[in-house]
Amino acid sequence: MDQNPNMIDYKKLVDGYLGLADWRVKENSTVTYSIGGLILSNSGAVTANYWLSHVYDKEIADAHRRADIHLHDLSMLTGYCAGWSLKQLIQEGLGGVPGKITSSPASHLSTLCNQMVNFIGIMQNEWAGAQAFSSFDTYLAPFVKADGLSYKEVKQCIQSFVYGLNTPSRWGTQAPFSNITLDWTVPEDLKDMPIIVGGKKIEGITYGDCQREMDMINKAFIEVMLEGDANGRGFQYPIPTYSITKNFDWSETENNKLLFEMTAKYGTPYFSNYINSDMEPSDVRSMCCRLRLDLRELRKKSGGYFGSGESTGSVGVVTINMPRIAYLAIDEQDFYTRLDKMMDIAARSLKIKRNFITQLLDEGLYPYTKRYLGNFDNHFSTIGLVGMNEACINAKWIDKDLTHEKAQKFTKDVLNHMRERLSDYQELYGDLYNLEATPAESTSYRFAKHDRERYMNIISANDYGDPYYTNSSHLPVDFTDDIFAALDVQDGLQTLYTSGTVFHAYLGERLSDWRQAAHLVRKIAENYSLPYYTLSPTYSVCKEDGYLEGECGLCPYCGGPTEVYSRITGYYRPVQNWNDGKAQEFKDRTEYKVDNDAIGYSQEEPVEAVESVLKLIVTKTCPKCKEAEKLLTEANIEYEKVYAEDNPEFVRKLGVKIAPTLIEKAYVEPDADDDYFYYTGINGVHRYVNYNKKGNGNDE
């Protein structure tokens, strides 16, 4: 008897996961190989089969199975991403769902931090993608003011928030995918509004009166993110987005030093460009309130690359395989005919999904979403694309990649055509549609893998190794090491998307200091119109010696294995967790070099070495540095403490790459060059202390 095609081979499914034989095991790099991952894999296969067999019609299901399009998040019977009103949580508390406990509005910062962690964790189980809060620092500041909290108390609260969000509490042994936007300075639309604490407005105190407390929140958050975990590993969540406005203060404030040191070292923040883009800082709070008077108007999704503005988001994402359309098209007219057909299928699938999950919402399947959101009216239906660079190469009438003007012009025409089509769908279906530069963590690999098997002569991003397509309309990953040459091209393309577009400045290793990072961030904001961008240095982590600059397969100090971290389609994960296609992309990348003259940055004169015999190189936020200081002090060993942040040239001159590092000046002949002994990491300091307790002198 023939097997029903909708039946799942459970043995193949489980064995494929356990033996890592199925590429989907690494489809999402945030999911750890674990029993939770196995459960998610099994349930995901069942749910995906349900979508394709019982919800979508045959035309939609076949288009996905053939890899003409990719229906994202088939493994979950939920919407895609959502932004939530932190103001609403502060006013109403956490709860209000029948049969579940309810917490009153928070009266203290510690309580609010706990409620935010629980809220995001709950919502992450009702959605497939990122959960976001806007104006994090603005809304939290009044709680600091109301209780007169010390900086130590504020930092403790923020620390519990960050650690709570990074606990793998979500299905699949994942941490909740979370994003926050930080205003840095009090937004104009909130300045004169009375603060809310304990669910009540407090007359006589406005958000504009809380800038000092905002600074405390921002300092605490950045210090926690800079410190990383006990092994020096950067925190994955929340992904912070900072607003760069025309009145951004670029002076050498304490918080600026911390912000751009975090950027230089870990590449953690996203930056929203409010200087030259057509966005406004208040968009994250006002999008849900706008009247839809013109059905053809395409709105931009606010709230950051992954995040969403208050009470907005996306019900689902469908990505179109652009290289295949170009490869099969006879000419340009045929290309647009094929593209329109795929867009029609994508738009219809999103309408079906919206109707289906709206029915489930009304039936109570997402109780907390129903309580805090109510409906999906302000959530987009999202259509994205992958491989426009390879589409241009495969198109017989272009036959060039995106580094050529002919291909760039064609790409702009295609994106504008897609925008017009989205306006048609808004009129037809009455829903919001947007055009996204899809992150495509697994989709770029899936499309290329299918196409290489099916079409012998189709061109992917690489001629060797595992195939992949370039994300959205990005340039070839090995195009140039000149960041501004890449920006010049991308600026004209990325501004045509209405969501999910970002420029990643991939850097081989951390920038030299916070000033260099600040100069580069400012140069981009003031000279380009693209809405979001990041600086993305590669770094490694050794469990013994902590943070290491750049890509280090083995620790240069202890010889042990490391985790190499880079940004995969928007967030940092160990490269060994990436799927084969993205891992190949990482190998192929040409990283950008930063020309200091181009960004108007000049390094300060080298700091001369002082004459003390023993120096301890530390950073201001590293817990292992404090441990090293304690070891030396308790052993009655005299030393001079040198902050790496304040003496970057001196530290670079001595070749120090890890904090803490203990440097001992060796005895040499009077006219000889200085020589030094290095004791690297906390283990090196331990060795020095233990050896010198015995009075034996140097051990290296």
Predicted regions and their residues:
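Conserved catalytic cores of very large enzyme subunits
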Residues: D2-D377, I398, H404-Y557, V564
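Hydrophobic/aromatic-rich, well-ordered segments within soluble, folded domains that form packed cores
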Residues: S178, L182, F376-I398, C555-N579, ...
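Thiol-based oxidoreductase modules, predominantly thioredoxin-like and allied folds used
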Residues: V618, I637-E649
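Structural micro-motif
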Residues: R652-E664
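Local sequence-structure signature of Cys/Sec-based thiol-disulfide redox active-site neighborhoods
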Residues: V607-I637
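Intrinsic, low-complexity terminal and presequence regions
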Residues: S540-Y557, E563, R567-S612
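Short amphipathic alpha-helix with an adjacent loop that forms part of the alpha/beta core around
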Residues: F650-G655, V689-N692
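Non-catalytic, surface beta->alpha helical segment in thiol-disulfide oxidoreductase systems
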Residues: K665-E700
